């Protein structure tokens, strides 16, 4: 049986690995997950990512986490907003700020998967995938 929400699975794996200070975490490969990883890398929340093959030949997205020191984490929390049972869409002029601009919302738009700031600049709306701070 297939997975219902690969994005929520990815965010949960990153959140759990982050809490125990893992250097990297393997997540399910999907195009949207790769695009979310690109945005997280660009905004500085993760160190990087790679697409590798597992022993069965399936693609796996390996996300490299980063930490400022041994006690603190860069990602305080990462939450799914739009879910399969309740999609959340925003218009270009109605995009809310996450923690008054401190955090980042990742939005799937017609211009690709971008941050809330980029969506506001381009005045495009879309589906709010998740929030990170």
From Swiss-Prot:
Species of origin: Syntrophus aciditrophicus (strain SB)
Statement: the UniProt record of this protein carries the keyword Ribosomal protein: yes
Function: One of the primary rRNA binding proteins, it binds directly to 16S rRNA central domain where it helps coordinate assembly of the platform of the 30S subunit.
Protein name per Swiss-Prot or TrEMBL: Small ribosomal subunit protein uS8
One Gene Ontology cellular component: ribonucleoprotein complex
InterPro entries cross-referenced by the UniProt entry: Ribosomal_uS8, Ribosomal_uS8_CS, Ribosomal_uS8_sf
Annotated keywords: Ribonucleoprotein, Ribosomal protein, RNA-binding, rRNA-binding
Pfam family, one: Ribosomal_S8
Family: Belongs to the universal ribosomal protein uS8 family.
Top-level taxonomic group: Bacteria
